[in-house]
Amino acid sequence: MGQYNFDQILDRTHTKSLKYDFAVKRGKPADVLPFWVADMDFEVPPELKQILLDRVNHGVFGYTESDDEYFEVLQNWFTTRFNWTPDRKWLVKTPGIVFALAMAVRAFTDEGEGVLINQPVYYPFSMVIDDNDRRLINVPLIKGEDKYTIDFEGIERAIVEENVTLFLLCNPHNPVGRVWTEDELKRLGDICIKHNVLIVSDEIHADFVWKGHTHKVFADLGESYAEHCIVCTAPSKTFNIAGLQVSNIFIPNDSLRRRFIKEIDRAGYSQLNTMGIVGCEGAYKVGAPWLDELKEYIQDNIQFTIDYVANYMPKIHVYRPEGTYLMWLDCSKLPLSPKERDEWIINEAKLWLDTGSMFGVDGEDFERINVACPRKTLEEGLEAWRRAYEARGF
C-alpha cells in the first residue's frame, strides 16, 4: 500500500457539490450515483490541504497576486513532467479554461466567422462558439474499432471552404481519450500554419496520460508551431481543485498575447481569487508524489472497468483511454434509441453519466463515465448497471 489512501470514501453531499447536490435540480432522481462531471472523488493531497488551511488561518483575504515563486513552481512542473520550459512572459492567468476559450473566440474571430472543432468533443467547445455568434464548423473524428483518428483532409478542406481562422484542439482528448502523437500534432499544425489558422490547445488533462503514451505540449513542437498557438493548462483536473477557479494560459506570440489580454480586460476580469493562487502554487509544489500514486490507482480502475464491461455487459464496447480518467462507452449494439438508453441508465441503473449526445451528434451512441473514484464506488456503479442490463435481457 502506498502513502495515500484512495480507497477512502468521502461524503460529498451537502457541500454544494455540483456533482452530488444538484441531481433533482437537473432533472435526475435524487438517488442516482454520479459518474458524470469530470472531477474526482478523492481528497486533495494532504500536503496541499495543509497549505490551504494555513492560508485560511491567516484570516485576511484581501487582493492577492501571484509572484515569482508562483511562476517558478509552474515552470518547474512543465519542465520536469513534459520537458517543456515556458517563458514567464507567455503566462496569462484566467479563472478557467472555458473562460479562456471564450476570450480567444472573441479576440481572434468576428461574429459569423467559422471556428473549427472535432466532435465528439468537450461540449463547452461548441458552447463558446454558439454563445458568441460564431459558426461552428465540425470535422468529426474518424471512429475506428479501438481508437479515433483525425480527419486531416477534412480539416484542410473545411478551413479553405469555410474560411476558418481559429481551431479549438483538445489534447488529451475528452471524451474519446486519445493522446495525439507528435506526428499527428505536427501534421495538424502544418495545415493550420499553411492557412494562417490559430490553434487553441486545451491540455487540461495532460497530467493523466497512461503507460505507453506521451503528452506533447503543442507549443513545444517547434518555434513556428508555438507562434501559431495558445496552450491552455490548469491544475484543476490534476489535483481536484476545479472549485478554486485557476488556469494558466501560455501564449508565446507577443501580438496574440496582447490581443488576448485586451479581450480579458474588456470583459472586466482582473485577478485570480486568493485561494486559487495559493492552491495552484501549492499543488504544483507538493503534489507530485500524490499524483504519481493516484495515476496508478486510476489506471487500475480503467482496467477494472474494461474487464467488467467485457465480462458482464458484452454489447457495450469500451474505448481504452490513452489519457484522461474519462471512459468512452459505445452502446450502439443495445436495442435502444439514445433517449431510451439514457432513461434506462438513469431510472433503472440509477446512474448519472454524461450522455454522448452532449459531445455532438457523433456521440449519440455513447456514454461517458468518470472512473476517478474509490474502487468500491466504481464497483457499486458497474454492478448497478449490470443488474439493469441483465433485467432487460440484453
Which sequence ranges carry the predicted segments?
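Short clusters of hydrophobic/aromatic residues that line enzyme substrate/ligand-binding pockets
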Residues: I9, F61-Y63, I150, F218
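Short acidic, glycine/Ser/Thr-rich loop/turn "cap" segments at secondary-structure junctions
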Residues: N57-V60, A104
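Short regulatory "switch" loops immediately downstream of catalytic or recognition motifs
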Residues: K16-A23, P140-K143
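Conserved N-terminal alpha-helix of the aminotransferase class I/II PLP-enzyme fold
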Residues: R55, G62-P95
